[in-house]
Regions:
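Pocket-lining segment of extracytoplasmic ligand-binding domains
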Residues: 150, 225-230, 235-326
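Bacterial N-terminal signal peptides that target proteins for export
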Residues: 1-10
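Bacterial lipoprotein signal-peptidase II cleavage site
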Residues: 24-33, 46
Length: 400
């Protein structure tokens, strides 16, 4: 487990960019105690995969006449709780391909069969640490894949994807620091004002924007982060990037030499409000997939709600998949349960401002495009938010 964080960050670096963050306020008290995490796991992480409850969700669940089978979705990493909605859709007959890091089976929602098979493919080493969009333009069998707003814009000229639903309303990426060393630091702006070195991977996206906006100075940005915890723990006086849905748990319960949750702020709260891990389709495929998406996107919306309000089923599949993959990535039931609760507490998953789950705000996307241009990041001329997403398939009645 101690090696998994830096390996994940290495994968992100190799996938051509940093995952920029999104919203909700972070603080240094968000990590649960070890006992709480274990108790939550008993309720929502260790249950059998067939623990879901049959429900009548009021949706058209017949995908057999409109969707390809299997419907293939490419993720950006190994199975983890942030991907819960996708694994919620996998039926109890699922199989795990440990060689190719794929979970597949009949598609279901609330115990009801959807009439097709579904295939959830891991990213990272399964696709040579490429971004999902790269794999989608290499392998035509993939129908949808994860994408993140800032990377979506920089890649638009060559590898465009149109986002059709955002399972996460807020990106989990953070900047974190040691609250004992810096008790008066409360925000990313405070980090900048104090002149604290910010240890990142290579510059890209949000660092350029923060420098351009005067939040940080260029000499604060140290792009030498190797993904491991050693320097942050040993030196103590650095700020560092991470994920709110994992790092607080790992630094408190896994990295025993540190033994506490770091303080942090989500990048969203500092103004970098990207959508992370939205599901995108290639523009050339949109019309062909439209009849499928009209039914499938509302089903994903409901799966988001189901996997958060009762995460036992999806967490069990995720943990089973990672164990069966038997790779360098480890993912415990305790972390899965803690992560879901953390996503709830921070608003990483939830409704937008209009009470609808999964839809996207064009103004928020346009603000990222504008910030990228102001920071000197090269984008396709004329690119605007409306080109890159659609809410047309969203069911406005579905939310938490």
């Amino acid at each position: 487990m101690k090696n998994t964080t830096w390996l994940r960050w290495l994968a992100i670096l190799l996938a051509l960019g940093l995952v920029a963050a999104a919203c909700s306020s972070g603080n240094d008290d968000d990590a649960e105690t070890a006992d709480t995490a274990t108790a939550a796991s008993d309720d929502s992480g260790d249950s059998d995969a067939d623990a879901g409850t049959d429900t009548d969700v009021g949706l058209d669940l017949d995908l057999g006449s409109v969707c390809p089978s299997p419907l293939v979705i490419q993720t950006d990493w190994f199975a983890e709780a942030e991907h819960g909605a996708l694994y919620e859709l996998v039926g109890d007959d699922y199989t795990v391909d440990g060689d190719n890091l794929v979970v597949s089976g009949s598609a279901q929602l609330g115990g009801q069969d959807l009439g097709i098979d579904i295939e959830v493919r891991s990213g990272g080493p399964a696709i040579g640490f490429a971004a999902p969009r790269v794999q989608m333009y290499t392998d035509d069998s993939i129908h949808l894949g994860y994408t993140t707003t800032d990377q979506q814009m920089t890649a638009w000229d060559d590898l465009p994807l149109i986002s059709v639903i955002a399972p996460l309303d807020i990106n989990p990426q953070i900047i974190m620091w040691d609250a004992d060393v810096y008790p008066d630091i409360k925000s990313i702006a405070d980090v900048g004002a104090a002149g604290i070195t910010v240890n990142l991977f290579q510059a890209g996206g949000f660092p350029e924007a923060f420098v351009a906006q005067g939040i940080w100075t260029q000499d604060q940005v140290d792009p030498s982060y190797d993904g491991g915890p050693a320097r942050f723990i040993a030196e103590g006086d650095l700020a560092q990037q991470g994920f709110a849905s994992a790092e607080p748990f790992n630094y408190e319960f896994v990295f025993e030499e540190y033994g506490k949750a770091p303080a942090f702020q989500l990048l969203h709260d500092a103004g970098w409000q990207v959508y992370s891990q939205s599901l995108g389709v290639k523009p050339a495929d949109l019309e062909e997939l439209r009849p499928c998406l009209e039914k499938f996107v509302p089903i994903v919306q409901q799966a988001i709600v189901d996997s958060v309000t009762n995460p036992a089923r999806s967490n069990a599949i995720i943990v089973d998949a990672v164990e069966t993959f038997d790779s360098f990535w480890a993912y415990s039931a305790e972390l899965a349960a803690w992560s879901v609760q953390q996503q709830i507490d921070l608003g990483l998953v939830g409704n937008g401002g209009d009470g609808i789950v999964g839809n996207m705000d064009g103004a928020r996307i346009q603000a990222i495009i504008d910030a990228q241009r102001e920071a000197g990041i090269e984008l396709l001329d004329g690119l605007s938010a409306e080109d890159t997403f659609t809410n047309e398939f969203i069911d406005d009645s579905i939310g938490f």
